[in-house]
Amino acid sequence: MKKSVLSAVVLSGPLLCAQAQAQLSPLGMWTPIDEASGKPSAEIVISTNAAGTLSGVIQKTWIVAPGASAACDKCTDDRKGKPTQGMEIIRGGKKLDGKDVWEGGKILDPNDGKEFSVRFTPIDGGKKMEVRGYIGSPMLGKTQTWVRVDK
């Protein structure tokens, strides 16, 4: 009996570690928290594309900024005039060697059409993520907390 319990513990250890490690990733569904209201503002699904870099798409939006359109009228690239729902707002980014941090990509604010460099850092065991948008240096940016959506 002791041998089978020990075997179960030894065999399940790697599975539990793999599950915990998988959570320390930006992949999955996230909801940004609106700074003004403190409420969720959207659902964004982050996956990897064929190149192995991050891609994030808005699945749903709940809060629209005053005067904002359901389309990205202020975008200056291929997203100009396209609906924000279903829009790819995260492009690029890879995991830094030896760290649970993803960088090198861009994130779009569809309310004003501005694009920023972005850094993703899972926190709280992967239940939350710090998303830092910046121009130039990460020190010159703004961090928003996103919450993982379990579905």
What residues fall within each predicted segment?
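Exposed beta-sheet edge/beta-hairpin loop segments within beta-rich domains
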Residues: 118-122, 136-137
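Central antiparallel beta-sheet cores of small beta-barrel/beta-sandwich binding domains
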Residues: 27, 32-118
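Structural motif
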Residues: 50, 123-125
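Exposed loop/turn and edge beta-strand positions of beta-sandwich/beta-sheet ligand-binding modules
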Residues: 24, 40, 140
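Edge beta-strand at a domain terminus
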Residues: 126-128, 134-151
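Positively charged n-region of N-terminal signal peptides that target proteins for export
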Residues: 1-4
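Bacterial N-terminal signal peptides
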Residues: 7-15
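N-terminal helix-cap/turn-to-beta initiation motif at the start of protein domains
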Residues: 18-29
